[in-house]
């Protein structure tokens, strides 16, 4: 690809240093597997509470009344949004203050604290616990993803498959966690009618502590990657960041308390500000880097739409499963929580298949924008199936067949495989070298905006009196048309985005 020689280009910025030579395991740097297990346990903790949050809010704070479904969905969306929005600050702390390794360790410790606080059955402590998890995850999540990218050179052909393996760690934790925590909550310490949600939160806290210890023991494998600069290795900066976390928790608590609509304004302002910072840095580095940043920001916008509808999985789909899906198999009832594992099982099963398809496609392998477009379209197909089930398959008891929601999760998973692993790798290739952490933060912030919108949308699906067949059908019909339109537009503008990416694959 020719470059305008009359203008400064990204070549003016020194390329990132080559990673050290690592011993390999199964063809990849050995530290990848340490990061894999660290992320596995963090996702175990995260997804352990995911299935329980909206059900717990309705049961604990609304005495089980269906009118609590809409507020629960909005709280869930706001919490997820803030989890991902906090990544932009975590990226900054790692880039400029603490280094990636110590950011991960501090974040894990703060997250574990928040998970144990959630177990206290008080509304204020519940939201303080959520706020603490948000702050800790902001330090942890973007930086462990960035560490994966730092194990490979930009041109390393193993890079994308390395991110896919890392993504498998995410999904293994997410698969096991709902099953195990549901058994603890309903079979060991509670009943189907009265689950012990406290045990869900406690088990998740223990999982987070395991993640912390695993990374602490294994970080020597990284050979200095992500370590703080020589002038930033003292304990003083760690204490400064811990004080910052303590000060940030009340701010996040306030944002949870003000509601999803106000939060949406805050998140939008943050996204615009971050986009400007990335664009200014891209312009400073030259025309090629500027174009790459523009391409990345366009894809971020479509990422918002994907997650707005995908994250119904943890909110409105949970109420759908609990109230409108026929989960009975003779004398046994399929637990609502276990639907959260379907996505992860599908990811683990289908990820090698999707990867094989991309390899075999050769020159017909879709570009990054078209893969994102496919992700949107598959997400839309899932909503089309829901439309069909709610309009044509409702039985006399007002229930839809089990297989319909099961397949919705599977189809959404195919869409996720087209989009999310590619997105993580894309950011490390397109973001300005000096602001890769901010680039990851932008990816997670766009996901967070989508998550907050998902909570608002879930509230509309549930309605003021709780979810009904008619309210679900109306909401999911809108979801189908929105996703179909977004996917079609992205396919149409894909050639323009490819041009802006200057050969990045």
Say what each PLM segment does:
Residues 1-28, 154, 185-318, 323-328, ...:
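Intracellular loop-helix junctions on the cytosolic face of multi-pass helical membrane proteins
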Residues 158-186, 200-211, 245, 340-347, ...:
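Glycine-rich segments within core transmembrane alpha-helices of 12-TM secondary carriers
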Residues 268-278, 332-362, 375-383:
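Transmembrane alpha-helices of Major Facilitator/SLC transporters
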Residues 51-73, 186, 313-337:
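Short amphipathic helix-loop junctions that connect adjacent transmembrane helices
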Residues 103-104, 372:
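Primarily marks hydrophobic transmembrane alpha-helices of the MFS/SLC 12-helix fold
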Residues 40, 114, 125-140, 300, ...:
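Hydrophobic core of transmembrane alpha-helices in multi-pass small-molecule transporters
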Residues 106-127, 377-397:
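C-terminal ends and interior cores of transmembrane alpha-helices
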Residues 73-94, 141, 175-177, 341-354, ...:
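Central cavity-lining transmembrane alpha-helices of secondary-active solute carriers
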């Amino acid at each position: 690809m020719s470059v305008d020689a009359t203008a400064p280009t990204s070549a003016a910025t020194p390329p990132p240093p080559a990673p050290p030579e690592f011993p390999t395991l199964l063809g990849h740097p050995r530290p990848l597997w340490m990061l894999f297990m660290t992320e596995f346990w963090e996702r175990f903790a995260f997804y352990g509470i995911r299935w329980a949050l909206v059900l717990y809010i309705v049961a604990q704070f609304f005495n089980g009344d269906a009118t609590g479904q809409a507020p629960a969905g909005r709280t869930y969306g706001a919490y997820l949004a803030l989890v991902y929005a906090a990544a932009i600050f975590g990226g900054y702390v790692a880039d400029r203050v603490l280094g990636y390794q110590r950011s991960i360790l501090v974040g894990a410790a703060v997250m574990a604290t928040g998970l144990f606080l959630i177990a206290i059955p008080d509304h204020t402590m519940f939201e303080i616990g959520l706020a603490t998890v948000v702050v800790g995850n902001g330090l942890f999540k973007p930086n462990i993803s960035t560490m994966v990218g730092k194990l490979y050179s930009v041109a390393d052909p193993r890079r994308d498959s390395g991110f896919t393996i890392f993504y498998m760690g995410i999904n293994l934790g997410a698969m096991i966690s709902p099953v195990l925590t549901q058994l603890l909550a309903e079979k060991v310490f509670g009943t189907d009618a009265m689950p012990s949600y406290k045990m869900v939160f406690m088990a998740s806290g223990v999982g987070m502590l395991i993640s912390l210890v695993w990374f602490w023991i294994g970080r020597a494998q990284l050979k200095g990657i992500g370590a703080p600069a020589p002038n930033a290795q003292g304990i003083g900066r760690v204490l400064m960041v811990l004080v910052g976390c303590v000060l940030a928790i009340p701010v996040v608590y306030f944002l949870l308390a003000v509601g999803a609509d106000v939060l949406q304004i805050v998140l939008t302002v943050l996204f615009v500000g971050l986009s400007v910072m990335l664009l200014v840095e891209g312009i400073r580095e030259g025309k090629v880097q500027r174009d790459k940043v523009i391409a990345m920001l366009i894809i971020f916008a479509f990422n918002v739409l994907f997650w707005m509808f995908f994250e119904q999985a943890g909110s409105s789909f949970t109420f759908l499963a609990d109230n409108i899906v026929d989960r009975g198999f003779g004398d046994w009832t399929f637990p609502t929580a276990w639907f959260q594992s379907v996505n992860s099982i599908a990811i683990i099963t289908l990820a090698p298949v999707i990867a094989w398809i991309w390899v075999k496609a050769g020159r017909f392998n879709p570009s990054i924008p078209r893969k994102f477009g496919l992700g949107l379209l598959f997400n839309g197909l899932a909503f089309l199936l829901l439309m069909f089930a709610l309009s044509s398959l409702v039985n006399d008891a007002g229930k839809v067949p089990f297989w319909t929601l099961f397949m919705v999760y599977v189809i959404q998973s195919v869409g996720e495989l087209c989009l999310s692993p590619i997105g993580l790798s894309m950011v490390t290739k397109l973001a300005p070298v000096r602001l890769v952490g901010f680039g990851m933060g932008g990816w997670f912030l766009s996901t967070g905006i989508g998550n907050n919108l998902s909570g608002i949308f879930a509230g509309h699906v549930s309605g003021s009196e709780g979810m009904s067949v008619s309210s679900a059908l109306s909401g999911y019909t809108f979801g189908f048309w929105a996703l179909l339109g977004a996917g079609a537009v992205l396919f149409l503008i894909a050639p323009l985005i490819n041009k802006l990416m200057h050969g990045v694959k």
